[in-house]
Amino acid sequence: MFEIKAKAPVFEISHKYVENPSAAQYAQHTHAYCELLLFVRGDANFNIDGILHHPKPYDLLIIPSATYHYFIPRSPKAYENYVLDFSPDLVPIEHRQKLFAKPTILNVGDDAEFRRFFELLDLYHSTYSPEDFLLACRSLLRELLIFCSYRMDSSIPVESTRNPLVETMLGLISENLEKPLDADFLAREMMLSKSYVQNVFSQEMHIGLKKYITQKKLFAAQADLAGGMSAADVCAKYEFSDYSSFFRHYKKMMGVSPREKKRSGA
């Protein structure tokens, strides 16, 4: 078992085994990079942006950036997984668009070629120095992602469920990030009460609606800043109330100011 953290384009590679997992060990989270999670064993649910999934051994979760997700143990049964966190820029755009258009779950239990990639991670970790391990993993991960892209053409995604009201809310949020989004907006669009919209969203997503909207806007802002747009123009585009509010929220979430993000281009 191992856990290696690094800098872009590969942020984390791990193979973990947890005895007696508990809910307190796992928090809902989101991040600006993509994730592959191979569920090896355990008894749990995953919530991926409101999609509730009870995984089977060797379910591969393909999680786009800026997607809320968390692990919910159902019993103390031991939990084993592989996790790879990485920049989507690691693969060509045509594969990126296919892989990360939405969360996808594939079962690779009967696919020895798929499982070989993860077995190689263990072999590389036990054989190479930390520096050479990361170099080898970059190449292996790039190959794995391209392999995933081709396998998606012939594989049947695992079906999971999401509350249809939440599905509608998430669609409205994604389509209207450049508007002054809030619970009132969603309530009007869906012809529901504001309190009902807020309650359903928080119960299903385990995050407040206002916080979710703010963070989705910030991830969109991050992409525009990396593309060269000015911080002031990004603030106006995503309808933040004022620049100081945008600056404060951005720095708290990203760890750098919007201007620093633009200068770094990363």
Model-derived features: positions:
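Alpha-helical elements of Rossmann-like donor-binding domains used by nucleotide-donor carbohydrate transfer enzymes
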Residues: L120, A136-S139, E143, T168, ...
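Short, Lys/Arg-enriched, Trp-marked, Pro/Gly-tolerant hinge/linker segments that flank
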Residues: A101-A112, S126-R138, L145-E175, K179-S193, ...
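Residue at a beta-strand N-cap/secondary-structure junction
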Residues: N45, P180, G228-M229
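Generic protein-terminus/edge-of-domain signal
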Residues: M1-K56, L60, S75, S245
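A hydrophobic/aromatic-rich effector-binding and dimerization subdomain
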Residues: M1-N20, L60-D132, R142-S154
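Terminal helix-turn-helix DNA-binding modules in bacterial transcription factors
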Residues: G171, E175, D184, N199, ...
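Regular secondary-structure segments
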Residues: V40, R115-S129, L170, S174-L177, ...
